[in-house]
Amino acid sequence: MTVQKSKNPQVDIAEDNAFFPSEYSLSQYTSPVSDLDGVDYPKPYRGKHKILVIAADERYLPTDNGKLFSTGNHPIETLLPLYHLHAAGFEFEVATISGLMTKFEYWAMPHKDEKVMPFFEQHKSLFRNPKKLADVVASLNADSEYAAIFVPGGHGALIGLPESQDVAAALQWAIKNDRFVISLCHGPAAFLALRHGDNPLNGYSICAFPDAADKQTPEIGYMPGHLTWYFGEELKKMGMNIINDDIAGRVHKDRKVLTGDSPFAANALGKLAAQEMLAAYAG
């Protein structure tokens, strides 16, 4: 007899009134191994250009009923794109708004993945000891070695990044200096940092996690309540076009902005980003 997994969010005892996703939702949307494949870059980049990862530094996201969702950056959405980019020859640095450590949704970590987990262990210190984004921004100029800015997904991207002037400055620098911007799922919420000033992403098309899907996740206990705002609605108000209305592992390229719709797009986005960056920097 099959026992139905619970759809009740699981208590996170590290914080008052905080919750992890339900057993049922984890069984549907996480896996102990990833879908990493196609990592084949026979002529990797050998230069000095690298990736700047803007990571989440806050774990708890308030929902409409006062309960907190225990979140952070999604491991698959973070590590698979970086795995491809690293294999293609691009090193990376990590920055957070505060300079404090990256928060991960460890409940989504592919802990039995024989490629992703060693990669994570190899680079864990970068996530534990990130740069402070303001310090990075202060040093940016036309000759800076960052070839791309990567904003991973996970609901942690909804906390702080959309209001950060440092995030806005980093994105403005990237677009104006012909660098790549890479993001997926909830990561594009960081683009909202541009909405109150100079917005070089006006008119761009992207893939992102649909608001409609976010509105459904509390039904299966993925979140302990509904979001208090929806980033897709806000991106559209600032002139961006979200081309997907479902979660199908879709990726999209608009000039040098490369995006994906969900963790199901992480591997494909990694391939796309590696191919595009090799063409630009190693061609």
UniProtKB/Swiss-Prot annotation:
Zn(2+) binds at H86, E91, H123. It is found in: Cytoplasm. One of its GO terms (biological process) is DNA repair. Its main location: cytoplasm. InterPro entries: Class_I_gatase-like (IPR029062), HchA (IPR017283), Prot/Nucl_acid_deglycase (IPR050325). Keywords: Cytoplasm, DNA damage, DNA repair, Hydrolase, Metal-binding, Stress response, Zinc. It catalyses: N(omega)-(1-hydroxy-2-oxopropyl)-L-arginyl-[protein] + H2O = lactate + L-arginyl-[protein] + H(+); N(6)-(1-hydroxy-2-oxopropyl)-L-lysyl-[protein] + H2O = lactate + L-lysyl-[protein] + H(+); S-(1-hydroxy-2-oxopropyl)-L-cysteinyl-[protein] + H2O = lactate + L-cysteinyl-[protein] + H(+); N(omega)-(1-hydroxy-2-oxoethyl)-L-arginyl-[protein] + H2O = L-arginyl-[protein] + glycolate + H(+). The active site is at C185 (nucleophile). Homodimer. Protein and nucleotide deglycase that catalyzes the deglycation of the Maillard adducts formed between amino groups of proteins or nucleotides and reactive carbonyl groups of glyoxals. Thus, functions as a protein deglycase that repairs methylglyoxal- and glyoxal-glycated proteins, and releases repaired proteins and lactate or glycolate, respectively. Deglycates cysteine, arginine and lysine residues in proteins, and thus reactivates these proteins by reversing glycation by glyoxals. This is Protein/nucleic acid deglycase HchA. It comes from Escherichia coli O8 (strain IAI1).
